[in-house]
């Protein structure tokens, strides 16, 4: 008899470890529920793992949220940096980036809310780490992209 509920991460993961299964389960819960709040019992059920593993791998639920943010934002920063470094017209880079942003928010609709919560609710050192790893590199990439477009005569220079 087939189950009609969501698949357990442990049933769908090919070779993932428990840490990755917990991160993916948290991501699925946030996508399915359109929320950034989750309970450890729901996480445990979805991952098919003991909720004590959250403390083992992440220290607490906040640590899990930071690991999820690191996974998702790390990919974004890496991809944006690679795009800016490509040898192509700035307007094409912008077009590709906008498409990637749409794809990202379709795949991870919780990401912006999670990022804002982690910056707002984390200790100052953790908030600074998030800014240094993700927000500053994204801002720098945008500055470079716009500057390249202005130099190429494709974008107008404006005073924000």
Q: Model-flagged regions — what are they?
A:
Residues 1-17, 28:
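N-terminal intrinsically disordered/low-complexity leader segments
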Residues 18-27, 43, 68-72, 76, ...:
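Generic hydrophobic, amphipathic alpha-helix propensity
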Residues 67, 81-111:
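Hydrophobic alpha-helical connector segments
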Residues 143, 156-160:
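Hydrophobic alpha-helical segments that form the core
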